[in-house]
Amino acid sequence: MSHKKVERIDPLTQALPCVGCDSHAHLDGEEFDADREEVLARARAAGVATIGNIFLDPDRWRRRRGYFDAHPEVFFVLGIHPCDGQQCTPEVLADIREAFAVDDRLRAVGEIGLDFYWDDCPKEIQYQVLHDQLQLARELEKPVVIHCRNAEAETLMTLEARGFVGYPLLWHCFGGDADMARRIIRNGWHISIPGPVSYPANKA
């Protein structure tokens, strides 16, 4: 069986026809230390007007937020990833709360959720950390960015049971089926489209 070669788009010659938003980036990572400015410039050239940078703990936010001082197009999201749930102590939660109090570029709590693909954190701890951070988001009146992998039903049930239907929420890197997408949209939430949708083996 022959395979048709997929022609790749050059983002610098075929920029978005209207402004776009990259809702989920980790540009504070060490892997960008050599060319962060060039990456941000290429994003602008491709039509990306707004970028959400996710800080995975308050210490990273504190040490690396300054990388974006000259880039008002970058907003911040802060939370404890489910795989790092064992690090989410009451002191860390208090630190996150304080960060939101002093930095108006912090716009959402995330990425938080459940990840049953990796075995980095016991499930019961992940549930507790998710509950704690959902409560914090309500307290701060901030939207939520959800990370979910191999735990779609559990994450949906948790959010619905805790009264988050209609709450401002972005389901990051959505990988579910059409029925799940419809349920998320009915709940008043948003979905971000991940890179894997471009893989030839994936179907709409």
For the regions a protein language model found, what residue spans apply to each?
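Mid-domain alpha/beta scaffold segments of enzyme catalytic cores
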Residues: 1-204
